[in-house]
Amino acid sequence: SYPGEIAAKFAAETLKVKKVAVLYGTGDPYSSGVGKAFADAAKKAGLEVVAEENSSSADDTEYSSQLQKIQAAGAEFLYAPYYYSVAGPYIIPQARSVGYDGYVMGPDGYDGLKMTDDKSLYNNVLYTTHYSPDDASNAKVQDFIKSYKKANKNADPNTFTALAYDSVYMMAQAIEKAGKNATRESVRNAISGMSFEGVTGNFTLDKKGSPKKSVIVLELKDGKPQYKTTIQPSK
């Protein structure tokens, strides 16, 4: 649900839109959970949710009917939490074909977005993710990239590499915090409520181990993702 909450915060505070819409797949827990979280957070942020549409699954190929309703409702911003294989070739082009030219935003499922040949369709498309090599706000990022390239024949690290890297150092921090005679239980207790500063952002883990963290926003320009901003979690 966290990506949906962050998207609502971004729409309200950064883009400063007033009318938003959401489209999600009811048969997919990821899509529906994030989509509903966005709608709830948007209302709390004072945004008007002019349309809340859904599809029977998260891998349909036809969304024109729902998108026509969203366009007719006057939405300035559409949150569509689907995967790269659906949002890229179907939802975004179909939204443009019904006359919707506003913002489209998604979660990290947009990483590696499959696009059609007409890259202009993807202007005003954004998504949240964990990591960007262009993030100048985090000094750890460039050090990580240099070290990774040196150890891996100049290969570029991706989001999952960065997440794995942070996981190792987060565990090391927890073990150190647990002390010299660390046990499984003491390490688990050390992780609970622990704050961590990593390549993928700064975050705090709650008692269940779920992170409340900063999130990267990328914007597509000429079909290529570019760093837009970093959103810090609400206190």
Task: Name the predicted role of every residue range.
Residues 92-165, 219-221, 225-234:
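Extracellular/periplasmic periplasmic-binding protein-like sensory domains
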Residues 1-54, 77, 171:
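An alpha-beta-alpha
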Residues 34-130:
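Extracellular/periplasmic bilobed ligand-binding domains
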Residues 53-56, 203, 231-233:
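Generic detection of short hydrophobic beta-strand segments and adjacent strand-loop junctions
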Residues 24-25, 82, 148:
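Short glycine-centered, acidic/aromatic-flanked micro-motifs in structured strand/loop junctions
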Residues 12-17, 39-47, 68-75, 93-100, ...:
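Sec-exported extracytoplasmic/periplasmic mature domains
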Residues 150-162, 172-225:
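Segments of small-molecule ligand-sensing domains
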Residues 1-19, 32-34, 60-63, 88, ...:
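Hydrophobic alpha-helical segments within soluble ligand-binding/sensing domains
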